[in-house]
């Protein structure tokens, strides 16, 4: 349930990012979504101690990747807050950064539990 909540927030943040990009007149790359799908598929090839199927290490890897993504998102919100605050006054960039901090804290707790199970 906690992971589902974080994932729902991440999806909401993606939609906000699209709106921010529109506000700034930044086009969305056609290649980046394709690259993300490719990276996700390649990530499945990563050795997790099992030839087939899902292992506890798989969950650990997934949580680590989520943490990396959320940390990057938090840095983006902070950077936009300091560089485009006037252009993006309709967005609460500080609150978005704080939400990312909360997401990181939740993911860290989940990561610790997954590590205990995996190691």
What are these regions (language model features)?
Residues 7, 14, 67-70, 74-77, ...:
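Heptad-repeat amphipathic alpha-helical coiled-coil interaction surface used
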């Amino acid at each position: 349930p906690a992971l589902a909540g974080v994932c729902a927030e991440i999806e909401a943040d993606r939609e906000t990012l699209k709106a921010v990009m529109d506000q700034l007149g930044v086009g969305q790359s056609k290649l980046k979504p394709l690259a993300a799908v490719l990276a996700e598929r390649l990530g499945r090839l990563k050795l997790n101690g099992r030839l087939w199927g899902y292992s506890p290490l798989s969950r650990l890897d997934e949580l680590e990747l989520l943490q990396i993504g959320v940390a990057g998102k938090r840095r983006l919100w902070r950077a936009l807050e300091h560089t485009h605050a006037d252009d993006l006054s309709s967005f609460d960039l500080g609150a978005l950064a704080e939400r990312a901090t909360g997401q990181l804290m939740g993911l860290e707790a989940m990561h610790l539990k997954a590590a205990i199970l995996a190691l």
